[in-house]
Amino acid sequence: MYELMENKQRKFWFYVRKGIFQVLLQLVLAMMTVWDFAGQNNTGTSYNKLYFYTSFLLVLYTGLKQILEYMFSICSEEVVFKKQFNNSRSRDILMSFDMLNSPSGHYIVTTKRIFKLRYSKSNLFIKIDKLCWFLGIDSPVLIPFNIIEKLGNIKDNLTTNNEDIYLNVTLTNLHKYQNDENDTEEDSEDIEKNSDPKENSDIDSLIPKVIETETDLNIKELQSELFRKV
């Protein structure tokens, strides 16, 4: 529940920044332009500074966005994902047939742009990913290299010829990772239920504990972004 609220808050502020750069600044500049054409003589210092800085930010943002989108088209590729359909979250989706009352399972096919694996450990692309997050620009998913090493079984043999294969292995293991962890937690609960209460102090030391490292948290974030139910 806490993770869901945190993801919603993160998305909220992402769209706030996106609205500032893509909507608010352009509206301010448009209103000032209309005000000028209306015949008002606005020669004050504050007005001129506001006009200049608003125009400068818009030009800078537009230029950066065009450069980044061109870079994304070269350095990333589209990957198709099949997401499970969740009735409680998807009632606002318009369907051509009745999926809500059907007993069989349904899936939604989506596409995501993912940076090629060769850029995962590049400091430049890590900074680009953070810059896009700050500016509210939708960027391809950058899979951290430590996750690729853990889930893709990569050592030092990543090349342009085999990165597609490693991406497939990484995404497959990324999808299965949470299930394996949940199985471990369920096994722990079964051990606790079947154990004698008098011997809990001895058995607790034998129950496998799931320790969430920073890598595990990053894996959960990627799972939420790529495989979360629609």
Curated annotation (Swiss-Prot):
The chain crosses the membrane at residues 19-39, 55-75. Disulfide bonds: none annotated. Glycans are attached at residues 41, 86, 157, 168, 182. Residues 172-196 form a coiled coil. Residues 180-190 have a biased composition (Acidic residues). Residues 191-201 have a biased composition (Basic and acidic residues). GO terms for cellular component: membrane. Its main location: membrane. It comes from the Viruses. Residues 178-205 are annotated as: Disordered. The keyword Glycoprotein applies. It is found in: Membrane. Keywords: Coiled coil, Glycoprotein, Membrane, Transmembrane, Transmembrane helix. The keyword Transmembrane applies. It is a multi-pass membrane protein. This is Uncharacterized protein R455. It comes from Acanthamoeba polyphaga mimivirus. The lineage of its organism: Viruses, Varidnaviria, Bamfordvirae, Nucleocytoviricota, Megaviricetes.
